[in-house]
Amino acid sequence: MKVISFLEADSLKTFFKKFNKVIVALSGGADSAAVLQLSSQFITPENILAVTCVNPHVFGYEIENARKIADSLNINWKPFTVQYSADFLKNDDLRCYYCKHEILKSIENIRKTEGFDAIFDGTNIDDLNDYRPGMKAIKEFNVISPLKELGISKKDSLHIAKSSFKTIYFNVESCAATRIVNKMITFEDMLKVEKIEDILRYRYPGIRVRVSENISVEFKNKVSLKKSDLEFLSKIIKLHYADKQIKINY
């Protein structure tokens, strides 16, 4: 597949040809999908392994996306799980670091065991402008970020992903753990949030169901809601949180 025009083929070739065997941390989102697509153009597919964490904080549709993306490129796909640390579950400001550390520790073990040269992730150039505690773990495990190194933005990576995998639904997504606010993270809450958002996601793209003492519904994109929408949203949420008040922000 032809690389989109703003990327110089020579620059891509120079970058990727430095690596023989790589693991791509494939979340199922657009950034890591773009990394896998670009990697597959310059590294033999047999020398690429896509790995995906399948713990409850990862939405099931993204796990399925990851599997389909790897399959479409004839790249081996390996799901894995991690043990959540107590530090992660306490849900403080470093939650993302603790999570990323455990994930990358598992991937590093796979890399060593199976003899791969490097780990690629989907960090893009725009991520450098955001507060991302997980970046510390990326440095600790010497993870390589091709999009960042090549100056590829979030918008560009989304274009690559959508152009390459036309049947995949890509959404700007954060994990289920981010939906739990000012309380400890529990498996129960993560699974409930997923069940709710699975029903609502395609009707209301960018929806975020936040769980704290009560429920807050937010929308990443501007929406116009009718009374029937508000009733429908409340009905779906009440199936899982009957005892909580619901605030819908729009």
Residue spans for each PLM region:
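ATP-dependent adenylation/nucleotidyltransferase module used to activate substrates
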Residues: 1-163, 231-243
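Generic alpha-helical secondary structure
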Residues: 9, 104, 186-193, 197, ...
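Mid-to-C-terminal catalytic subdomains of enzymes
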Residues: 117, 148-152, 158-209
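Short, flexible, solvent-exposed loop/turn segments with mixed acidic/basic and small polar residues
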Residues: 134-136, 207-210
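A structural signal for short secondary-structure junctions
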Residues: 210-212, 241
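A short interface-forming secondary-structure element
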Residues: 213-230
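Short proline/glycine- and acidic-rich turn/helix-capping motifs at secondary-structure junctions
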Residues: 245-250
